[in-house]
Curated annotation (Swiss-Prot):
The keyword Cytoplasm applies. Belongs to the DeoC/FbaB aldolase family. DeoC type 1 subfamily. It comes from Streptococcus sanguinis (strain SK36). Keywords: Cytoplasm, Lyase, Schiff base. The gene is deoC. It catalyses: 2-deoxy-D-ribose 5-phosphate = D-glyceraldehyde 3-phosphate + acetaldehyde. GO terms for cellular component: cytoplasm. One of its GO terms (molecular function) is deoxyribose-phosphate aldolase activity. This is Deoxyribose-phosphate aldolase. Pfam families: DeoC (PF01791). GO terms for biological process: 2-deoxyribose 1-phosphate catabolic process; carbohydrate catabolic process; deoxyribonucleotide catabolic process. Catalyzes a reversible aldol reaction between acetaldehyde and D-glyceraldehyde 3-phosphate to generate 2-deoxy-D-ribose 5-phosphate.
Length: 220
């Protein structure tokens, strides 16, 4: 198992400086992580720095609330890809899901999938705000809308991934769709537990600590 290729090396804090982003990029190149996950303002800088490597630039869409309109999310997606993003992580319309407005949730996801035009799309459910029934429904809608992955969390709400949620998501989507655990992986043991539960990608700021077999401080 190539653990490094499970990791989306992440820095989404609004106060992140160019120096910190550059450090993230250099670490990702050293460890050959799957991607770095950075805010859209850093796409072009990151894409330039990562030229010649296998590390992709992953960008959040409708982040962190998921409450933008579908048109805005679609524009963000096209803009991100045009600027060099190789993957996008969109946040669902959580309020619509809570309201059982499933058509809107599905249309919202589909708008991003269509705008991505083949670029990998991960759908953030924000599991800490959902019941198990809502988590299952969100997974089904993401799958129906043609997304590539379902993802637990933004890291900006009340909690991150749990092993139980990852297992539920994997059980719901079956073997062929990706599942990303984000927030909560602070050590090698954490990462392994998520992978054993069914995760195929892990979003974390602790990628280096995980690879070194250490435990990182912080909460994402």
């Amino acid at each position: 198992m190539k653990l490094n290729k499970y990791i989306d090396h992440t820095l989404l804090k609004p106060e992140a400086s160019e120096e910190q982003i550059l450090k993230l990029i250099e670490e990702a190149k050293v460890y050959d992580f799957a991607s770095i996950c950075v805010n859209p303002t850093w796409i072009e800088f990151a894409a330039e720095q990562l030229k010649g490597s296998d590390v992709k630039v992953c960008v959040p869409i409708g982040f962190p609330l998921g409450a933008n309109t579908s048109d805005v999310k679609a524009f963000e997606t096209k803009d991100a890809i045009q600027k060099g993003a190789g993957e996008v992580d969109m946040v669902i319309n959580v309020g619509a899901l809570k309201s059982k407005n499933y058509d809107l949730v599905e249309r919202d996801i589909r708008a991003v999938v269509e705008a991505a035009n083949g670029t990998l799309v991960k759908v953030i459910l924000e599991t800490c705000l959902l019941t198990d029934e809502e988590k299952v429904k969100a997974c089904q809608l993401a799958q129906k809308a043609g997304a590539d992955f379902v993802k637990t969390s933004t890291g900006f709400s009340t909690g991150g991934a749990t092993v139980e949620d990852v297992a539920l998501m994997r059980k719901t989507v079956g073997p062929d769709m990706g599942v990303k655990a984000s927030g909560g992986a602070r050590s090698y043991e954490d990462a392994l537990a998520f992978i054993e539960a069914g995760a195929t990608r892990i979003g974390t700021s602790a990628g280096v600590a995980i690879m070194k077999g250490e435990e990182a401080s912080g909460d994402y």
